[in-house]
Curated annotation (Swiss-Prot):
<keyword id="KW-0479">Metal-binding</keyword>
<dbReference type="GO" id="GO:0045127">
    <property type="term" value="F:N-acetylglucosamine kinase activity"/>
</dbReference>
<keyword id="KW-0547">Nucleotide-binding</keyword>
<feature type="binding site">
    <location>
        <position position="179"/>
    </location>
    <ligand>
        <name>Zn(2+)</name>
    </ligand>
</feature>
<feature type="binding site">
    <location>
        <begin position="4"/>
        <end position="11"/>
    </location>
    <ligand>
        <name>ATP</name>
    </ligand>
</feature>
<feature type="binding site">
    <location>
        <begin position="133"/>
        <end position="140"/>
    </location>
    <ligand>
        <name>ATP</name>
    </ligand>
</feature>
<keyword id="KW-0808">Transferase</keyword>
<comment type="function">
    <text>Catalyzes the phosphorylation of N-acetyl-D-glucosamine (GlcNAc) derived from cell-wall degradation, yielding GlcNAc-6-P.</text>
</comment>
<dbReference type="GO" id="GO:0008270">
    <property type="term" value="F:zinc ion binding"/>
</dbReference>
<dbReference type="GO" id="GO:0005524">
    <property type="term" value="F:ATP binding"/>
</dbReference>
<feature type="binding site">
    <location>
        <position position="177"/>
    </location>
    <ligand>
        <name>Zn(2+)</name>
    </ligand>
</feature>
<dbReference type="InterPro" id="IPR023505">
    <property type="entry name" value="N-acetyl-D-glucosamine_kinase"/>
</dbReference>
<feature type="binding site">
    <location>
        <position position="184"/>
    </location>
    <ligand>
        <name>Zn(2+)</name>
    </ligand>
</feature>
<keyword id="KW-0418">Kinase</keyword>
<comment type="pathway">
    <text>Cell wall biogenesis; peptidoglycan recycling.</text>
</comment>
<keyword id="KW-0119">Carbohydrate metabolism</keyword>
<keyword id="KW-0067">ATP-binding</keyword>
Length: 303
């Protein structure tokens, strides 16, 4: 049995998967964001509960919005303050009495998609999340590629490329990022970035869904904004794909439901790639919000 935990800022989602990788149990509980002992107890309690239910010791994987420090294995995270700077893996292993694997939640999302039946033959799968933030992960031959510092998938903290600044024009906003730097892709390509750019250029705040609906209805400002954003996305995807060269790219997060992306990217991205390169297949993520839990559980298969 494989246990997956998706530890977010407000909730912990648990999933149990059998040997056929079928989900056989689900539970959601509030995240004790500021109480580290309670966080440990909550996770350990769920493990004990489902060990008893399934009469076995499940293998444990955990995804969270952050990463482990590659040198001392303490957790680097903003959204789960209780775990910040703590040796979460070591403390969980001591409390539960078995191995625990921890990975960035975007990498878990990517791993979930890579292990979908339709993509298992793809040598490399990249998962990109266009949600509240922008980030992703690269899966190579069924394994998460984390890099020396466990930051290989932190694409949201790459800077906006020169082509993008030219495209956005003289009035381009220099947006700050939660990491403390400015100009990060996270601030521009996320659903939040989609809204911030609209507010910057048109002086009014609108939700992403309302901008998309206005575009479909023929609104001139919305149409201009969508055109600008699609080209911006293509420019940045071109840089990311050139550096990583994935076979398949799966998009998740709220903005990934904007169907126009799947029509426009195959047409726009190629001009930002090397002349010998082909644009990878770009698809909508199949497992949606459950991807983080699936990927966390699957860390113990090939992760």
């Amino acid at each position: 049995m494989y246990y997956g935990f998706d530890v977010g800022g407000t909730k912990i989602e648990f999933g149990a998967f059998n040997e056929k990788l079928e989900r056989v149990a689900t539970e959601r509980v509030p995240t004790p964001t500021d109480d580290y002992p309670l966080l440990l107890e909550t996770i350990a309690g769920l493990v004990a509960k489902y060990d008893q239910e399934f009469a076995c010791e499940g293998k444990i994987g955990l995804g969270l919005p952050g990463m482990e420090d590659a040198d001392d294995a303490t957790v680097l995270t903003v959204n789960v303050p209780a775990a910040k700077g703590k040796p979460l893996r070591a403390d969980l292993e001591a409390k539960i009495g078995r191995s625990v694997k921890i990975e960035n939640d975007a990498n878990c999302f990517a791993l979930s998609e890579a292990w979908d039946e339709e993509l298992q033959d793809a040598p490399s799968v990249m998962g990109l999340i266009l949600g509240t933030g922008f980030g992703g992960g690269l899966i190579y031959e069924g394994k998460v590629f984390s890099g020396r510092n466990n930051v290989a998938g932190e694409l949201g903290h790459m800077r906006l490329p020169l082509d993008a600044w030219f495209h956005l024009g003289d009035n381009a906003p220099l947006l700050g990022c939660g990491c403390g730097k400015k100009g990060c892709l996270d601030s521009y390509l996320s659903g939040r970035g989609f809204e911030l750019l609209y507010a910057h250029y048109y002086g009014e705040e609108k939700k992403a869904i309302d901008i998309i609906k206005a575009n479909a209805a023929g609104d001139e400002k919305a149409a201009e904004h969508v055109e600008r954003f699609m080209e911006l996305l293509a420019i940045c995807f071109g840089n990311i794909f050139t550096a990583n060269d994935p076979h398949v790219v799966a998009l998740g997060g709220g903005l990934s439901n904007f169907e126009l992306i799947y029509e426009e990217m195959p047409k726009r991205v190629p001009k930002y790639l090397l002349s010998v390169a082909k644009c990878p297949k770009i698809i909508k993520a199949k497992h949606g919000d459950s991807g983080g839990v699936r990927g966390a559980a699957f860390l113990n298969i090939k992760g």
